[in-house]
């Protein structure tokens, strides 16, 4: 039954078509006792047939016996696959080790299909794939050789969600920002498939999130198109504080870091290491002001407070004029405008004209519209459950209390606007009923005046047209 389960796994790496899977791989019971005594006497074709069956069933001891009987470790079966390539395709680390120890060529490739690519796209557990990749890298397999579609091993590992394999390949010299025939990088593949842990790891390893595909799409846009909104938000930040964190480590240090951490701890580390950076830290890192992080934390200054600071507050909290300019430029880029309602109140005086008062009301109405749009945008962007929150948040009670204050302020504003409306209506009624009031003369447009205006406009139009024509002819 184990052999039956393995039969469907012998597929060319990366989903590329290969007829090798139809290479007469018969699966059935092997009489180990008879094979042990008759191995030396079998003809070469029968030995190869038994070799294929042993590879299929993962029978390591029989593989060793057949190799001892004289069959080549790099024997090619029909369509060109070697035993090592087949062992890698089913992520059989023990079999890979035996074949490599017997001198199998780790750099073998068939039609641009390398053994390392086959291992990275294998159907198996990440633990077994990781061991196979480690063994192949130890025998100088090149992690940057691409297949016919220009996909490298790290792209296959990122596509299939193997975080530790990605990190190990980079430690082995894999290029993070290589692009395939469609312009996809490993980061683009991870974003497309929704592998958040891979995205975080690649950013940590120096992946460039601004590389576009051939159709001009960024990894963030690819994630959004495939409805991975959490990854879209993650890639839309100005700068990821983890970016390039492991680039300065040596190959040996990185391998040690990866292999001494079990998979559960590795996953915990990936998420916790990013969660340790709140929205304030991300904002400051993006502006190159990370030196202000500790100071602002000591003074309990949040990102919201920072974005609404006045000039004197910046100076009081130790920001230089250069730092202030960076923050103000970022606010302008993000289109975060501080609404100065204090200026509006100065216009509401008795001696203002009707036009000024109307402008005041229009401006107030426009600002309310902006606020409504801003709240609607926030509602649509917020994740639907707490597990999808990327950055560290403060206590939800802080948010709800502020929202309650906002509701009260909106109710007060509504009441005051109603009072203003009633007052304006009252003034209008009193003015209409005042016998001393002289109503404004309404301009009455007669048919004669309308004809005169149209005639004047037509004459001016023809005159302007003749003037243009005259200038054109003079130039010629």
Curated annotation (Swiss-Prot):
Keywords: ANK repeat, Cytoplasm, Developmental protein, Differentiation, Meiosis, Phosphoprotein, Repeat, RNA-mediated gene silencing, Spermatogenesis. Its main location: cytoplasm. One of its GO terms (biological process) is regulatory ncRNA-mediated gene silencing. ANK repeats lie at residues 46-75, 79-108, 111-145, 149-178, 182-211, 215-244. It is found in: Cytoplasm. Residues 273-335 form the SAM domain. The modification Phosphoserine is found at residues 17-18, 20. The keyword Transport does not apply. It comes from the Eukaryota. InterPro entries: Ankyrin_rpt, Ankyrin_rpt-contain_sf, Asz1_SAM, SAM, SAM/pointed_sf. One of its GO terms (cellular component) is pi-body. PROSITE patterns: ANK_REP_REGION (PS50297), ANK_REPEAT (PS50088). It holds the Pfam family Ank_4. The keyword Nucleotide-binding does not apply. SUPFAM superfamilies: Ankyrin repeat, Pseudo ankyrin repeat-like. Interacts with DDX4, PIWIL1, RANBP9 and TDRD1. Plays a central role during spermatogenesis by repressing transposable elements and preventing their mobilization, which is essential for the germline integrity. Acts via the piRNA metabolic process, which mediates the repression of transposable elements during meiosis by forming complexes composed of piRNAs and Piwi proteins and governs the methylation and subsequent repression of transposons. Its association with pi-bodies suggests a participation in the primary piRNAs metabolic process. This is Ankyrin repeat, SAM and basic leucine zipper domain-containing protein 1. It comes from Plecturocebus moloch (Dusky titi monkey). The gene is ASZ1.
